[in-house]
Amino acid sequence: MKAIALLEVQAMVAAITGLDAMVKAADVRLIHVEKRLGGRLVTVVVEGEVSAVRAALEAGAAAAAEVGKVKCCEVIARPHPDVMAFLTA
């Protein structure tokens, strides 16, 4: 079963640190990065199996929180095709 994890952080350094932890912690793949406010608000999206995505998000949020502020994070299991189209457009 596929899932996505969204990690929204304040600051690019926190996003990179969180993403690094996510891809090292589990078998997930980066599918989207969105930068807002000149990189002061960054959302990282990864995909993989549900258990891998959950483990990755836990590790990524913890790592990002050490160097910045985590605004929001969420796992979406079996995202609708329209959600995936929105993310990859």
Functional labels for PLM-detected ranges:
Residues M1-R40, V45-A89:
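Long, contiguous binding/interaction regions
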